[in-house]
């Protein structure tokens, strides 16, 4: 539970700059684009895979496409890039107002990854500990936002 209202949290998780600010993996470097406002909105995240130490991919860009959107309640997205299509996984957040703040659930679903991609990597790429850390960073970021 984050002691803030859902609108303040949603403002961070729907904004490309917010994605970079709360990333615990170290891969997200910067962003280009406007905050999401609807399904099919897109923005670009400039990445560096070297922080994971698993593949020598260097710097690259991904396009984030919003796949689910309910203002101040729910957002999901998939990623694709110049050298790779969306592979069937998605990320997101579910926000539920509760006494004293908002219950935030991180969504990270790899269950529909296309079989042809499974041999190409270790799934999921982002560890559970990094996802949990992102929630802590999200709380700190929301508290620091005026």
What are these regions (language model features)?
Residues 1-39:
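Hydrophobic ligand-binding cavity/cleft-lining segments
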